[in-house]
């Protein structure tokens, strides 16, 4: 009997250690994607990015690492400063962290480093019943010429109506430091955003997102010399179509197409700028563990 007691105690110790094992840092997913952006009248492809992403988890903490490389692509000759050919002039490294603090509230943080700026960001996401609220607030430290800026990208209120979400979006940008006379100090942007599923099959899911600008305004230090342009009321509208296809239980491929139409109005004597458009295409894969 005396010989059995130490064995029982040792077994209990092993079980206790397993039951109360410290959490481990684990990889949850990784993926790659290619993203292109284009504005009418500029390069063939204004921005072409290759993204590499990794997700991690530790206890109830979530982490993300993103690394990207950017290229400008143009195959035509221009007289307006755009260069012909393929040229890389930027890259990005980004760290994300998120932690739920209550059943309804999650806090987030982000650091983004690029050749032209460093970003320090905090945010939150809150939901209660059918009501939603979230926001990201960040400071951009500009590398080189230009002003450091403070940004607020805020969804003060939103509602879930079944699978559809409707949110009010407010964006505020403040240029910091000494602003020269006639230069922009801050800008305001008000939008309604709508998110909705379109189709859900055994492997394929389709969804859409709409962004509709209600109004935009800008504030300057004194009067501008030549006036300025803002988006016309309801003059900027963007639609996304998003698709995801599950190749296996762990591997998904996805794609996104976005298109935005823009209409401007001049202020302080400026002529209305020409209408233009913006487009965005993303294709990639994500592997989940």
What is each model feature region?
Residues 29-36, 65-69, 109-113, 135-139, ...:
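Transmembrane beta-barrel strands of outer-membrane/channel proteins
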Residues 25-26, 60-65, 100-107, 128-135, ...:
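Repeated loop/turn-to-beta-strand initiation elements of outer-membrane beta-barrel proteins
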Residues 20-79:
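Short glycine/proline- and aromatic-enriched beta-strand/turn motifs that initiate or cap beta-hairpins
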Residues 52-58, 95-99, 122-126, 152-161, ...:
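Residues on the lipid-exposed face of transmembrane beta-strands in outer-membrane beta-barrel proteins
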Residues 259, 273-289:
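Outer-membrane beta-barrel "beta-signal"
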